[in-house]
Amino acid sequence: MSAPKKRKSDIHSDDRDHADHQTKKEKHWFEEKSEQNGENRRSSIFKGFLKKVKSSTTLKSTNKSASSSKMDTIANETHLSITSESSITSVESCHSAQFPNVAKNAMLRTLVNRDSFTPVPPPDGESVTFILPEIGSSKLEFTSKMDDAISIESRMSIGSCHTIDEDSASIGSTSVFCTPSRNPLMRNGLRMSTRSVPENQDDMPPALFRSLCNSAVRRVPTSKSEGGGTPMRRSMRMSIQKRNLSSKNMEDVPEEEALTVSNSSIRVDAPIAEEDEEVFGAAKEYFDNNVTSHNDSADEGTCSMSRLSTTSERASGVGGSSIFQGRRSSIFRKIFPGKSESKDRRMSDNNQASEQYMDKKSRRASVVSFNEFTSVSGLSVNDSASKNPKDLTESPQQPKLRKKTASSSNLSQRISSVFRMGSNSTVKLNEYVPSPIVSQSSRRNTLTGNSSISSGVGSIASGTSDQGYGTIGSRSGQSISRCGSRRDDEGKKERTRRLLDRIIISDVPAGELLKLKIEQVKKQKQLEMDELFETQLTESSSSDTSQSENLQFDVVAVDIKADGSPFSTTAATFMDSELSKRVKEEIVSNYRPDRCGSITEYEPELVFVMPEQPQASLKSLNDSVSSNADINLDHLRNVRSGLCKSIEEWKRITKMRESSTMLIYPMFCQSEEEWDSKGTIDAIFLMLDGILMNTKRWMPNGKCILAGVTPNNVILLRNKFDELKLSVAISESDGPASSNDDFDTQSTASTSTVFGAKI
């Protein structure tokens, strides 16, 4: 019989023939697997693919990545093993099991010490202190004396502190990084599995150093679902303490409800001890006896609103020392109330007495207005504090209001609903508030779009808040209406009065006034040179008293071109060649982007304004109001800007004077069609009204003389000025508006201050 044919696989020697061969069970987890060529080979491609899928799924489920050449760092430093949450006895007795003997591994300890996280003792004997960074609630401090014992303070979630005394050599070793522990900030507190090197393997092969590091360092879960627990917040621990405290003082509540009551009001009967020098009078004594304190539960997102209690609550309470006497909230007791539990028992003890005597009218207008009388729910403090408990219980009991949790999400809706309820009902304050402060809320006509009954907090329409909100003033002891159109009309009237006081309409055209002013200046100069000319001047000026009043201006505003030459004929009558040269030098030397300037070394002082650069034809609001279809828009823009810039420059150069007067006229007008146009006249008065809206833009004691370009233009300006006077006189003759009207308080017959327009 022939010998069997040798195969290629028989040439390789078997590892089991060697003496130092170890089986799979005898091999340690950190030893490297030596795979031979024919060993552990997959039989097919599909089995290898399934094996790869299973290995990747396992890595994803355990949240561990493959080994890399770099050592993984600890992502969450609060997971160090020096803090532990175990029982009080196991912290002190079982600490030796938590720190295995890993200190013998010299190579790993050397690597960690090289990273300068664990302190290395210095060669000399000096005492050097190493302070590790703060980790969670623990702080480690090492000294160079390795034989000294250190104390690790571990703050437990139960609120007590315990110490662990260990040798500094073992704690400072790599066991800090490799030892499994319980995390005190985790709710479940389970230990996380970590491998440690056995004692019989002291010498570690260099080839396995990487696998040891990757397995020794604990990997932190990346998601909350894989972490096995979420950190316990401080608010959660406080709520647990509240529940434990409330369960000890609620014997009458069933056991299944004892832990659900976490938001209760503690009745404080004894006043808080204060210093002797702090005396608050009767108000302090009242609040000490009648204020119910409340606890805010921030973790559950609710807040209990404090309310003022009365003296009857103290008399009707079960006892001053009893705490947390809440109502029973089980569904069975709500549906089938027993005979022993009456309706008064099911009502809350905190607001029982206050809701018994609150009538329907006071509940609908429950606005606490903190003024001199301090009315609380329609009653003053003295009245509510001095009432007898018997009188309160004898009043007819009203049905209980629907109670709703006062969270921050619907707080604004509740406030506005209170204001709406107060505005719908007419509140009589004669019984609670003294007679001088009496006002009634009335319905307004909503056709004008200014209704006093709205859903926002801004329109506080309750009777109690009428006396302190939105009242501009009072006429004949009555409060002015808060209607928006009325307030706007009053503001326009005030600006119109200011305009009438600060604007003087000249009966002489501006060109003639400038000529007379030049003559007056020349005469004054001659008067200084020759005293004999004084008598002749007084005789000649006695007949022109009306014109001399309009000549009392010290500043004149003119319109010029970009090269310094006069723009209009009115400016040309005042500016000669010498003055035009000085204006041109001022423009070149002191260029200003606002295209205006002044010359103060002249009498009268000169304010010059240049026209605006032409822009695209965009119709503005003022152009549409003035209805200037026949006038160029650039012309109106120059009229308004010229007037505005001249007034601002006039205020700047005369801010140190007590008073000043400036002559103005319609600027940048070159034809009769332009200066006599209704749009030009309206633009002038609208700009003056807009400037006087802010008094800071006007000279404090300054006035302007408005003169026309031609005699016809003077008449048109005078007519517009008289219309403003008439509108103010008619509105003042209307008298005070009645607050009991069913329509808007503004009279339909009155004339508005929109210049010349009737409502």
Curated annotation (Swiss-Prot):
The record describes the protein's role as: Required for formation of the pseudocleavage furrow during the first cleavage of the embryo and also mediates aster-induced furrowing during cytokinesis. Promotes cortical recruitment of ani-1 and nmy-2 during pseudocleavage and cytokinesis and promotes the accumulation of actin at furrowing regions. Regulates establishment of embryonic cell polarity.
Q: Where does the signal peptide begin and end?
A: none
Q: Which GO terms describe its cellular component?
A: cell cortex; cleavage furrow; cytoplasm; nucleus
Compositional bias, Polar residues, is annotated for 473-482, 736-759
Q: What is this protein called?
A: Pseudocleavage protein nop-1
The annotated regions of Low complexity compositional bias extend over 448-465
Q: Which UniProt keywords apply?
A: Cell cycle, Cell division, Cytoplasm, Developmental protein, Nucleus
